[in-house]
A protein has these predicted regions:
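Short, conserved beta-strand/beta-arch hydrophobic-aromatic motifs that form part
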Residues: 24-149
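Amphipathic alpha-helical segments
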Residues: 1-21, 134-147
Length: 152
């Protein structure tokens, strides 16, 4: 675990999240809340490269770096877990899977071509090249996401 990952892990532990080893080839942990069971982040290494992915759909105005990471992830997966906005009055409500049918668990975003889409909130979004300089911003994002989880 890198020093940046350790700093985020310490913060998540202070909020009541615990690491749960993932059953994957690489060393990966999901950070799951002890009370609610909700996963807020995944950290570890993929192919020996440090990996940090977070959920931030509950953050009212996420930083540009996080919005860019979301759009990059949608494009990299060729739209997997994303679809058109089905309920214009309830944008974070896709209805495609059980994770989102309760509403409020998705990322609303606009592609560069102006298309409005919703990406499923069941999966954390990888943040590329995560370093020590990113820790304060990540803590702010995770604090806001945790507060949002508390309202559900």
């Amino acid at each position: 675990m890198t020093p940046a990952q350790r700093a985020v892990a310490d913060f998540l532990e202070s909020l009541g999240y615990a690491p749960v080893r993932q059953k994957v080839r690489d060393e990966m942990f999901a950070w799951k809340h002890r009370g609610s069971g909700r996963v807020i982040a995944k950290m570890g290494a993929r192919g020996g490269i440090p990996y940090v992915a977070v959920k931030f759909f509950g953050v009212p105005d996420p930083p540009a770096r996080y919005r860019d990471a979301l759009l990059r992830e949608i494009e990299a997966r060729k739209g997997q877990y994303a679809g058109p906005v089905r309920h214009p009055d309830r944008k974070a409500y896709c209805g495609f899977c059980p994770a989102c049918t309760g509403g409020g668990l998705g990322y609303f975003c606009v592609r560069s071509d102006g298309t409005e889409i919703l990406r499923c909130g069941a999966y954390p979004v990888p943040i590329p090249d995560f370093s020590d300089a990113d820790v304060p911003e990540a803590i702010d994002v995770l604090r806001a996401q945790h507060a949002y989880f508390q309202t559900l």
